[in-house]
């Protein structure tokens, strides 16, 4: 199974998207030498709504500053349809040789518009484009199949399901996705999962993906990411690569550390965005009070943070 490492992009949430350039270069150089890793996702492209820092607002000059113009064509960038520019001319094309994939994530309510934009993005850029289905655990089996039939005709190279809330247990839940995966596979799409570890099941879920011959998964060093983090790169990497990676971790141990929150366990239990966990922690709520609120959150408020719920 191939790997897209998202340490700088998803891990950016833990450092306010302000990675030191020296570390980012070390990271890029070290992981680029690992054949098991297909792409290194450096951050979000040209977004400003949540941060003014470098790795949330990438452009080609900033990417080249990290890659030092290596021409490896192994950089991925992420855009969130809800927040990104909808002008295709704002995106990199195949005229450069650093970025070779754009990954676009979409909420359920944005999918129709996101698909049309993704088609134009693929046409304009002529590089790989991935369509990432956010909040996948809150789709029913029927919704997944319906969504797959809608998405499959579009010219995406990868389709990803994001376990955004970290509440999937693929030992039991993967069967819910098999119909949709079959639709994508029959259309020649590569299929992968982004696994969060809010309930401690990322490694269990990874093993299920391997058993079922999925094409790709996301990782991050030491699970760096939003909330309680992601599938850990060092746990799934071929052992022959562990020496160099371990040295990179040792040299940057303080930077590469997140602290899982007990509030994440509750949001994961109820399939909620971990932004509620972040707010519950800020308010120093008791777990009992926090859970009483969480169990009443429904519909789109589960996936999209409603600031009116926890004031």
Segments and roles (model prediction):
Residues 1-311:
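Catalytic cores and adjacent flexible loops of soluble metabolic enzymes
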